[in-house]
């Protein structure tokens, strides 16, 4: 099991959301059972989408909230855009 914890502030609705670290993005991809290329296809990122995912994981580019929220849902974390209760 991974030692990476995903901070709660990364699992909030967009208006209160904090950008995840590259390690947190990598952990969500792992939990979802996805490679960067698979995630790129699911997210509709186009022909060079795997490069985009690598840039998110490498913290060279911020991940958009919508992409993060979809990945969290695929990872079984839930629909973070709905918030709690």
Curated annotation (Swiss-Prot):
Repressor is among the record's keywords: yes
Record-level Gene Ontology MF annotations: DNA binding
Keyword Transcription included in the entry's annotation: yes
DNA-binding positions: 28-47
Keywords: DNA-binding, Plasmid, Repressor, Transcription, Transcription regulation
Record function comment: Acts with KorA as corepressor in the control of the kilC and kilE operons.
Protein name, per record: Transcriptional repressor protein KorC
Gene: korC
């Amino acid at each position: 099991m991974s030692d990476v914890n995903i901070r709660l502030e990364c699992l909030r609705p967009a208006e209160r959301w904090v950008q995840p670290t590259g390690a947190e993005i990598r952990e969500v991809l792992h939990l979802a059972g996805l490679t960067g290329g698979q995630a790129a296809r699911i997210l509709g990122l186009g022909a060079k989408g795997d490069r985009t995912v690598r840039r998110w994981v490498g913290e060279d580019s911020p991940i958009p909230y919508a992409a993060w929220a979809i990945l969290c849902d695929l990872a079984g974390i839930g629909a973070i855009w709905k918030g709690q209760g």
